[in-house]
């Protein structure tokens, strides 16, 4: 399955969740429901995976990704009226910190909003091993 196919399937699952639950719930409700839907579709999903940003051998920041699908697509969820540039920047930062190339920003607002983002900066050090020491690659 290509990354395009994978992101398309994730988006389809998000629409199914939104069509079932409707708008108005907290982000965590949609996160849990989307994880269930993705797992039913046969995907490997990690939820609230820690992202440690390392500088000079020391952790200088820590984030948590909402969902990580098949260890290839980072999914950041929101439940707000509209998406803001800050939401997009958050996802791009997660992509940069992990070395993952592909991400989806999905908003479960009055209607589903989806933005696909790609890693913009390619660090000079191999980040996946340095930043996610708890993960096996």
Question: Model segments located where?
Answer:
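Intrinsic disorder/low-complexity segments
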Residues: 1-2, 56, 123-137
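Interdomain/boundary linker segments immediately adjacent to catalytic/signaling cores
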Residues: 1-20
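Conserved catalytic cores of phosphodiester-cleaving nucleases, focusing on short active-site segments
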Residues: 22, 45, 65-83, 94
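Hot-dog-fold acyl-thioester-processing enzymes
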Residues: 23-30
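A short acidic/basic microdomain associated with nuclease active sites
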Residues: 41-57
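Nucleic-acid nuclease catalytic cores
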Residues: 78-125, 129-132
């Amino acid at each position: 399955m290509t990354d395009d196919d994978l992101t398309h399937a994730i988006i389809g699952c998000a629409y199914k969740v939104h069509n079932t639950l409707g708008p108005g719930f907290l982000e965590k409700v949609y996160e849990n429901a989307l994880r269930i839907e993705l797992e039913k579709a046969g995907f490997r999903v990690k939820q609230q995976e820690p992202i440690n940003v390392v500088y000079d051998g020391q952790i200088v920041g820590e984030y948590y990704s909402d969902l990580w699908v098949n260890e290839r697509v980072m999914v950041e969820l929101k439940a707000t009226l509209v998406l803001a540039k800050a939401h997009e920047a958050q996802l791009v930062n997660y992509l940069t910190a992990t070395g993952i190339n592909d991400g989806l920003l999905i908003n479960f607002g009055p209607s589903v909003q989806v933005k696909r983002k790609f890693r913009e900066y390619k660090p000079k050090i191999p980040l996946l091993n340095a930043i996610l020491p708890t993960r096996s690659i």
